[in-house]
Amino acid sequence: MELETKAIHEGWKPGNGEPRQLPIYESTTFKYDSSEEMGMLFDYAGMLTSSGQAANFFAIFNICEAGGHVVASGNIYGGSYNLLSVTMKKMGVDVTFINQDASVEEINAAFKENTKCMFGETLSNPTMEVLDIEKFASIAHAHGVPLIVDNTFATPANCQPIKWGADIVTHSTTKYLDGHASGVGGAIIDSGNFDWMSHAEKFPGLTTPDDSYHGITYAKRFGKAAYITKATAQLMRDLGSIPSPFNSY
């Protein structure tokens, strides 16, 4: 089965006389015959949000709180630029924007002791400049931080940033994944490749007990699932931004 066929038809098999399109069910809860069956619906790799902007915010804020610093490409979507330069600045998060085509030495100079992550877009919106993911990943890892890549414009059909070294990938499903016509949403995908415990002092939210969640230390309890589990159990719980039924079909 080809990607195009899966993207259009996979996951819904209507019976005789049933609608070709999956119906929207206005319900917040669903019945399952066993906890095992329900557990098979979930994976540690990703989560959905109410918008692409929510996905980018959660992806960054999950590991970069007040007092933290982000190194970001200046060649990014205006909304993401303002999220970092204005909104998150009000929350105590600092950002240094760099020319993504600058030399490794110039980009290295942007890092600080409190840098928590790097951020860029596979294809910049709207200038369509291509990010050198391997270069960014190498630089980020040399400084002990993960690389977060917004893959909205490229979509997984054209590029899989994790294959090139990205640790966390975000999408605005509103755009190319959906067609920018029938729904609004976002997604965060974690590769599970970044070793949070090896850089424990940089990421206390993952490597020390969370008083809001029974004292759990996410990195120790959940291993590769630590990042997404924290984003779901903590940020989604406290800040919302869940997909609505009308955008979940």
Predicted regions and their residues:
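N-terminal "arm"/small-domain region of PLP-dependent enzymes with the aminotransferase-like
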Residues: 1-45
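Conserved PLP-enzyme active-site core in the AAT-like
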Residues: 7-9, 13, 47-249
